[in-house]
């Protein structure tokens, strides 16, 4: 992302916060239905945010496991994003087409640019994305999530007779 080094909006904040600074995003409509999608955003300081979109509504409570790395240099900043197939759901088909979008927000100007033009006045933002073709022979991974927990129960009865002798 070519930018004046001194004007890059970047500060460290918590995950899923701080999207009021320079960021890059990639979005996938994995079922190519124009309604449901996944969006991954990364700021210049490598703060991640991810969300699911459904009918133009955001679910920011969703958290996927993915990686990103950013680098700020004399020309601006660059980003590398790794999103494993296990982070998203997609159909079990030998040949797939997904919706795809890239975007960039520049804080100092309030500018938001997208790879595929989007008319914000028109509903169905995801339906306006480009098409990613050529995804072949990718099987949806097995998903299993385990949450460990412990449960206990304690039952005590008091005897009215208190003795100091041990009984067997």
Which sequence ranges carry the predicted segments?
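Structural preference for beta-rich elements and adjacent junctions enriched in aromatics
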Residues: 3-160, 164
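Hydrophobic alpha-helical segments, chiefly the membrane-spanning helices
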Residues: 166-168
């Amino acid at each position: 992302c070519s930018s004046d080094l001194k004007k890059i909006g970047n500060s460290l904040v918590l995950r899923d916060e701080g999207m009021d600074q320079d960021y890059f995003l990639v979005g996938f409509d994995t079922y190519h239905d124009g309604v449901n999608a996944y969006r991954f955003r990364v700021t210049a300081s490598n703060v991640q945010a991810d969300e699911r979109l459904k009918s133009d509504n955001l679910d920011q409570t969703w958290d996927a496991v993915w990686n990103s790395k950013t680098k700020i240099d004399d020309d601006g900043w660059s980003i590398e994003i790794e999103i494993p197939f296990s982070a998203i759901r997609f159909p079990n088909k030998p040949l797939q087409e997904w919706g795809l979008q890239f975007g960039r927000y520049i804080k100092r100007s309030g500018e938001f640019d997208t790879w595929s033009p989007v008319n914000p006045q028109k509903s169905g933002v995801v339906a306006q994305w480009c098409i990613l073709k050529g995804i072949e022979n990718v099987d949806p991974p097995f998903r299993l999530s385990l949450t460990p927990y412990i449960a206990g129960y304690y039952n005590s009865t008091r005897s009215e007779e208190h003795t100091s002798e041990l009984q067997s």
